[in-house]
Regions:
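N-terminal leader/targeting and assembly helices and adjacent pre-domain segments
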Residues: 1-181, 282-370
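Acidic, glycine-rich two-metal-ion catalytic cores of nucleic acid-processing enzymes
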Residues: 186-291
Length: 370
């Protein structure tokens, strides 16, 4: 029978997968907000350059002519920031409720009757996350930095284009990129990438803040926490070395000397790590014999869940959850075709299509009857 701590670990891993996917969708929406302004930004840039020729070109004159471009850039980044703030407010609502339901699911009812849980305010979670820096800056400061970075890339590209003798249209394409390349070869592409990283990191930052807020409110039933890293070929060295390491509630190492630093979800940009809290045993909670059932006492053993890798965790999940994570066909390939989750990636960590998988292992598809 799974103990309360086993349940916390399993559901924390499942939730980490959901958070990672959600952060990617948020990042894509934020990038789209910026992209929606690019056509108008390019048009304004062309108008500005029409008033400037190579003979009269100076940096100060360029900056003066880019006023309307700068205003549109500011408007685009502010729209992205407003959109991201709204996403985070909605996530705070979800995470506050999830943390409570997670512990209610893991802890037996008769234990909860003796040690009721304390809920947390979504508004407080959001306010705390917005007031705490991640990767050295507040979210509002990251937005300001993104605005300045985009504008600097535009100005530098225009200046370089004039020095090289490029036409205005060539300069505009260097700024935005080429349509037949998905606009990924322009000067603005790095800013898009940075915007996506900021969005993903902000989501992880808020989820981590919600976990900590709930733990702080219910620290009477907790005795520590364990770092859980997503182990694959994209895992950072900082997260890989901390996987499964235990810490006290105030971030002191237990049985090792690896520092906690900013913690999972915050230790670096786009961090996918989470942590699971370790419940005290019924004895440590001072619950006398007879106050709870024998099964509840066995569930509240206070032991740290045994080490598990992603494949071991995945195999324990229901087919429904497996299908939600990798899709029905891939879930069948794992259950009946002998594949593992690692088989879905190439050696560069890229997600393989079903056609690519079929070319690699046609027998697995036959065995799974897909």
């Amino acid at each position: 029978m799974a103990t309360a701590n086993d349940k916390l670990q399993d559901e924390s891993i499942a939730h980490a997968i959901w958070i990672a996917r959600y952060s990617t969708s948020v990042a894509n929406r934020m990038i789209k907000i910026l992209n929606d302004s690019d056509a108008e930004l390019t048009a304004r840039l062309l108008v500005a350059m029409d008033s400037l020729d190579a003979d009269s070109f100076t940096v100060s004159r360029l900056e003066a002519l880019l006023v309307s471009v700068r205003a549109l850039n500011r408007e685009a980044v502010q729209s992205m920031y407003a959109g991201l703030s709204d996403e985070l407010q909605q996530l705070a609502q979800h995470e506050a409720g999830f943390q409570l339901s997670l512990f209610q699911f893991a802890i037996p009812d008769d234990v909860l009757s003796l040690h009721p849980l304390v809920g947390i305010s979504p508004d407080a979670v959001y306010a705390t996350a917005m007031a705490q820096p991640f990767q050295g800056r507040l979210l509002s400061e990251w937005a300001d930095n993104l605005e300045a970075d985009r504008m600097a890339r535009i100005s530098n590209t225009v200046r370089q284009g004039f020095l090289l003798g490029d036409t205005h249209e060539q300069i505009a394409r260097k700024v935005r990129g080429h349509a037949n390349r998905g606009y990924q070869d322009g000067a603005l592409q790095m800013s898009r990438t940075n915007a996506g990283s900021i969005a993903k990191t902000a989501v992880g930052h808020l989820a981590s803040t919600a976990r900590k807020s709930f733990a702080d409110a219910n620290d009477d039933i907790l005795k520590g926490k364990q770092w859980l890293s997503t182990l694959d070929n994209r895992t950072s060295k900082d997260c890989r070395i901390r996987d499964r390491l235990k810490y006290t509630l105030d971030n002191k190492p237990i049985g090792h000397n690896v520092p906690y630093l900013q913690g999972p979800g915050k230790i670096h940009f786009c961090c996918r790590s989470v942590e699971t809290y370790i419940l005290k045993s019924s004895d440590e909670l001072g619950i006398a014999v007879g106050q709870i059932s024998d099964s509840s006492r066995a569930s509240m053993d206070g032991q740290v869940p045994s080490d598990t890798d992603y494949q071991g965790w995945f195999s324990r999940q229901s087919f429904t959850r497996q299908s939600q994570i990798v899709g029905v066909t891939r879930a069948r390939l794992i259950r009946d075709g002998g594949m593992s989750p690692d088989d879905f990636y190439n050696d560069k960590g890229e997600w393989l299509t079903l056609d690519q998988l079929r070319n690699r292992d046609a027998q697995a598809f036959k065995d799974a009857r897909v």
